[in-house]
Amino acid sequence: MKSFFRLVLAAVVLLGGVSCTKKLPEQELYGTWNRQRTEVSIKLKEGAPEALKAGVPVVEGIFKDYFSNVLKSFTFESDNVLKAKVVNPISQTESTQKGTYFYQIGEQLKVELTVEDDPVIGMFALFYGGMIGTQYQPTLKDNDLKLQMTPGVAKLLVLLILGNKELAGMVKKAAPAIPGMTEADFAALIEGMVSNIEDVEMSVSLQRGA
C-alpha cells in the first residue's frame, strides 16, 4: 500500500509542479497562520442519479470535518519556506511514519511537513503534495490566507480515498455520525460517487495567529 501511495504522490507532485506558485509579496505575511476551515466542493457528472446529488453534501461534510481535524498549523518562515503540521484524528498509537518530510515544488516553494502519529502517511503526503504545488493567493485583508488545491489534484485525492475501503472507513470514522445512514447506505453512496465525480475543489483558509 505504501509503494502505491509513493507512486501516486510522485504523480501528484508532477501535476502540482505544473501550476503556478506565487511568492508571498509582503514581509508581514510571514509567521504562523492557524488553520481555520477546510472547504470541499464536489461537482457530479451531468446525468448523475438524483440520489447521488442528495448525497453530495454528506460526502462534502465528511471531508470537511476530517481534514479540519487533520490540519493543524502553517508557518511561513520566508517568502518560499512553508512549514505545515498534521495529526491523525483517530489513531492514538505510535507510528514509524512519524517525522518531518521535505518537499520542493519548482524553484519557489519549499515545504517542511511534520506528521504526528500518522499510520497512513501516504494520504496526507498526497494531500500536501497537491496543496503545496498549487496556486496560493496571499490576501492581506483581515489577515486571511487561502491555499487552493488544483481541481485535478483535489479530484484525484478524493477518488483515491473514496475508492479505498480502508481509507474511506477512516475518513467516515473521524467524521460525526450521520443520522439514519447505515454502513450499507454509506457504501452505496461512495460507490456511486467514485463513478460520477466530475470535479472537486478544495481549499484551506488560514488566519494569522500564534
Language-model regions, residue ranges each:
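Sec-dependent bacterial lipoprotein signal peptides
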Residues: M1-C20
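Lipid interaction determinants
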Residues: C20-T96, Q104-A210
